[in-house]
Amino acid sequence: TADGYTVAALAVVNSVGSPIDPDTGLPWHIGRWTAPSLSSTGLRRLRDLLVAAPGSSLNTTIGLVATDAPLNKAQCGKMADVAHDGLARAIRPAHSMNDGDCVFAVATGTSPTTFPVSTDPSTDLPIGAVNRLLTAAADVFAESCTGAILTATSIGGPPAYQDFARKQSRSGGGPGTSH
């Protein structure tokens, strides 16, 4: 963040909603990723799959957002809540009745960044610093969801995004993207 803290995320995506825009064949939230190009045949196959996908009762997106900032328990809970905004940027619809979406948050407090405190050294971070951490949490979780989709490989069952692509490439970022 602008305050010198790091925020990173990790996501495992098996959602009912789609992370892919059926009109373009690209992720809803492309962020810093470069999606593999899809041939017209690949795009048609992807659209057919998205239309036919019935969903199941066993879907979820699960993830972790972590920071080196010294957050308290309530602030960590808020960071986990706000990370769901990133999920909603990357997957549509998000939080369906068939999803068990859950994001956890941890704060190590190991950053050397400090703020001048006039009275008590245990005082919480300034609200502006916390808000910047929350913004970063949503951003990196959206990036992480996109990265999970673009880097996944098939092991049988539903195909992975790469199965529809000509090649895979990315520029910057990744499932562990950090701010």
Task: Enumerate the language-model features and the residues they cover.
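A structural signal for small-residue-enriched, beta-sheet-centric alpha/beta enzyme cores
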Residues: 1-179
